[in-house]
Structure formats: C-alpha cells, structure tokens
A protein has these predicted regions:
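Glycine-rich phosphate-binding loops that contact phosphosugars or nucleotide phosphates
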Residues: 1-158
Length: 158
C-alpha cells in the first residue's frame, strides 16, 4: 500500500492534472471542477494486491489462498504492465505464483528480494537483491530501494 501511495499521488513533485482534464472537470461543473483540478494530482496507475479483503477471503475459501495474487495479476494485468514482487526470501509462494502469471501475461517482472533472490529471481526481468540474510534487515533495505524506484519513476514521468 505504501508504494501505491507514492505512485498514485505526488511523492516529492507536484503533479497537477493535465490541461485537458482541468478543462473537462470545469465543463462538467465549473465550481467543483475548479476545486478538483486544483487539488487532484496526476498519478501513475498502481494496485496493491494486498488490499482486497473480499476477493482474498473468497479465493482462500474456494480455491487456494496462495494463488490470490496470481488471480489478481490474471484479472488486472495487461501486456506491458509491470509486476513488482517483494519477498525477503525470494521464495514466497504467493509472490512466486504471481510472478509466473505475470510472465505468462507479458508483464515485466521486477523482483525486490533478499538472501540469494530465491526462485522469484529466475522469473524476474530485473531482480534487485539486497545483501542481507535476516528478514528484518532485508525489510529495512527494501525501504530505500523502493523509495528510489518511486523517485525515478516520478522524475521520468513528471
């Protein structure tokens, strides 16, 4: 969810809506359109696969909980999209299934991993493996890495 927050709104840069969107908003309603175009921020489409409780519990009950992320990649993912899989071991079954599904659908796979990169490394177009073995240390190193990725994306697109 944290990464989605950095991508869907301004992280360090102001991201005003386009003139086209501003005009369309003001056409629909001049007063609200002005307020919306002033306060809304241009985002990069991002979805956290961890935030859909209804789908997750239904899929866990009816099918297999370890495939919940893969199911979402199957439903949401389009060729050319990017799947960012985060796993401290590189072997998290739910992230591994999602990475395989992403590759099958033509998504680019970035693995943010620890230890030796595990099995997910083999399905990643780009594997970022932080040099630690202990879970808490891997998690601490993942934070500046994904912040750097968000900063680079924001700089590139805005």
């Amino acid at each position: 969810d944290h990464i989605v927050g950095e991508l869907m709104k301004g992280f360090v840069k102001k991201r005003p809506v386009s003139e086209e969107i501003e005009k369309a908003l003001k056409t629909v309603d001049p007063q609200m359109g002005a307020e919306l175009s002033e306060k809304l921020q241009q985002g990069l489409p991002a979805i956290a696969l961890t935030g859909h409780a209804g789908l997750t519990t239904a899929f866990m009950n009816d099918v297999d909980g370890s495939m919940t992320y893969a199911e979402q990649v199957l439903g949401y993912g389009k060729e050319g999209d990017v799947f960012l899989g985060i796993s401290t071991s590189g072997n998290s079954k739910n992230v591994l299934y999602a990475a395989v599904t992403a590759k099958a659908k033509g998504l680019k796979v970035i693995g943010l991993l620890g230890r030796d990169g595990g099995r997910i490394r083999g399905y990643s177009d780009t594997a970022i493996v932080v040099p630690e073995q202990e879970t808490f240390k891997i998690q601490e190193l993942h934070l500046p890495v994904y912040h750097a990725l968000c900063l680079m994306l924001e700089e590139y697109f805005f």
